């Protein structure tokens, strides 16, 4: 069988491990709250039409999103999660011999998206604090670059790109180069300096902003996200999309979630408070913890990552391990903030001086 060698060599996306029956899953940055009753009812009302294809164009949801963001409806594109939209946009601009530039470590799907499009990944190392090095990212752009991905806040390390940093970056980027601003965790951000991409669209005709209903809105199982950007770019993404990939269940759940947004954002605020409490506790233990602005925190466990992951697992906590780099701990239910702190206290005490995960002083 003549398979593309670069595809064969590319690891498949690795989902966060499923927790054992009595364990707690803190590996996939899922919203710990169950769906609202109004959302469940909206989804249930679609089940009688499972024999029919979905309204994948989603005019009602696109209208709602366009209204709330102050853009034209043709500047909104729906997809089965923001990662599907990223795939479409990259396929629309990049192919063999082209480059896609992004920071690393970042979202684990980026390398595969570039490879499937036939393009080459150019990975720019993060700063020591886990944030994007935007001057280095701009310097990595060449004549072969077709897209740059900026992940803010950065998954899995946590820091945001500030509005000032992004403005300086965009001033260095060629106007015909597509910039993809991945804002999957935008609703969790509490740092007022963080960039907010959608108001910048009128200033940057080469910018597309991606959002999702998976995280803050708790619709991870239904797979729905959206892109906001220039109509011509999104038309190209639609041409690169798999047909009928957005289900009616996902669409009506998103609409119902927007109607119940106040209640959902109260949940988000509680998760952000738990996140801050978890980070502060880890810092008090002596860990060097990057800025955390999502629904997770990052521990730079380095070569001790496998042992650290095993220690969390032994305590009934399934976390996301990135071999030889670090561990991402999702913020779960209220009662499970203390349990990661208990495990990390023992781990932190064993770190040698000079370890990247150990706070100086």
Curated annotation (Swiss-Prot):
Gene3D superfamilies: Aspartate Aminotransferase, domain 1, Type I PLP-dependent aspartate aminotransferase-like (Major domain). The keyword Electron transport does not apply. Disulfide bonds: none annotated. Keywords: Aminotransferase, Pyridoxal phosphate, Transferase. Its cofactor is pyridoxal 5'-phosphate. It catalyses: an aromatic L-alpha-amino acid + 2-oxoglutarate = an aromatic oxo-acid + L-glutamate. The keyword Transferase applies. The modification N6-(pyridoxal phosphate)lysine is found at residue 215. One of its GO terms (biological process) is biosynthetic process. Belongs to the class-II pyridoxal-phosphate-dependent aminotransferase family. PANTHER family: HISTIDINOL-PHOSPHATE AMINOTRANSFERASE, HISTIDINOL-PHOSPHATE AMINOTRANSFERASE 2. HAMAP family: Phe_aminotrans_2. Aminotransferase that catalyzes the conversion of aromatic amino acids and 2-oxoglutarate into corresponding aromatic oxo acids and L-glutamate. Homodimer. This is Aromatic amino acid aminotransferase. It comes from Leifsonia xyli subsp. xyli (strain CTCB07). The gene is pat.
